[in-house]
Structure formats: structure tokens, C-alpha cells
């Protein structure tokens, strides 16, 4: 069974059962193969812990360092990385077939804002009543959107028609 470097299941100080170990001191210098008693006395003399890093069949690799300080910094690093992760939000904007130029420009600016923030934008174009007879007009609006946002966004999937809707998702380039 392989153990990950510095896992939570590392053996520390007297928990190490091997008679001899490969020792790396606190300055990361390879000391060599020594008895476990000598390795423990070296660790105690500098008030640090002897930690088994890799368990081999012959001689486990042990290092001298402050294990509690390492565990604290490792947990802090993990929590900091979780805080920095950004969840991707999908914003949805709905269009109608007979959208005016000003309304189109307002929604285009909203799309640009969402994309610049790193969000995905779902575009839904809805056909009402007999508008469904002219899906090519809806595709023209979608293609115009793709062209107008081509400098900052790209379509994640091709526009597809589902009933009386045409859907498409835009993502950052």
C-alpha cells in the first residue's frame, strides 16, 4: 500500500515500528540509514518530531520537522484554496422575436457584463403564437448575438430548437 507524502496516517516518533530508518534531518540533508533510537534522539535534541514519510519494505524514509506546525499550515492552505475557488453561475436572458434595437443593446450589455465576470450566459429566444412559423428570423437574432459577442465570448454549444424556444449558452473565450 502506497502512502501519500505527509498524509494524516503518518507515523510519528514512537509510533514508528521499524528498527532502522533512512533519515533526513531538519535541513533536508540525507543522513543515511540509522537505528530508530538514534533518529528519535536526534529529533528530541532539536525539539522536533520524527515523521515517517514513505514506508518501504526495507527502510522507511523519515524526516525531522515540526509535525503540528506542518499540519496547521497544510489545513490553512487547503481552506485558502477552497475560498479562492469560483463557482460558475449560469445567467439566463430571454429574448423575443420582435425585440427592438434598444432592448437588444441593453441585453447585449448585460451579456457582456456577465461574461466579463466569468459567468456563463444562457440565451433563450421564445416564439409566441404564429412566430413559430419563422424560425429563421430567430436564428438570425442568435447569430447576430454570437457575432456581437465574438470578441469576449464563444458559444458553448450550437443553438438548438426545443419546441417554441431556441437555446444557446455563451462562455468566456
UniProtKB/Swiss-Prot annotation:
Transmembrane domains' residue ranges: none
Gene Ontology biological-process annotations: ribosome disassembly
Disulphide bridges: none
GO MF annotation: an example: translation initiation factor activity
GO cellular component: cytosol; membrane
UniProt-annotated location(s): Cytoplasm
Matches recorded under PANTHER family: TRANSLATION INITIATION FACTOR IF-3, TRANSLATION INITIATION FACTOR IF-3, MITOCHONDRIAL
Name of the protein: Translation initiation factor IF-3
Organism in which the protein naturally occurs: Ehrlichia ruminantium (strain Gardel)
Amino acid at each position: 500500500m502506497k502512502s501519500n507524502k505527509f498524509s494524516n496516517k503518518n507515523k510519528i516518533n514512537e509510533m514508528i515500528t521499524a528498527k532502522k530508518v533512512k533519515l533526513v534531518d531538519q535541513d533536508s540533508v540525507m543522513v543515511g540509514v540509522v537505528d530508530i533510537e538514534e533518529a528519535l534522539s536526534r529529533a528530541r535534541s532539536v525539539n522536533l518530531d520524527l515523521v515517517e514519510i514513505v514506508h518501504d519494505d526495507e527502510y522507511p524514509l523519515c524526516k525531522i520537522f515540526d509535525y503540528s506546525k506542518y499540519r496547521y499550515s497544510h489545513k490553512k492552505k487547503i481552506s485558502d484554496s477552497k475560498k479562492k475557488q469560483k463557482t460558475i453561475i449560469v445567467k439566463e436572458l430571454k429574448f423575443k422575436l420582435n425585440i427592438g434595437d434598444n432592448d437588444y443593446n441593453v441585453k447585449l450589455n448585460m451579456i457582456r457584463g456577465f461574461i466579463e465576470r466569468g459567468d456563463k450566459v444562457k440565451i433563450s429566444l421564445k416564439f409566441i403564437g404564429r412566430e413559430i412559423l419563422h424560425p429563421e428570423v430567430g436564428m438570425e437574432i442568435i447569430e447576430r448575438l454570437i457575432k456581437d459577442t465574438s470578441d469576449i465570448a464563444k458559444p458553448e454549444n450550437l443553438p438548438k430548437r426545443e419546441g417554441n424556444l431556441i437555446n444557446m449558452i455563451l462562455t468566456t473565450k
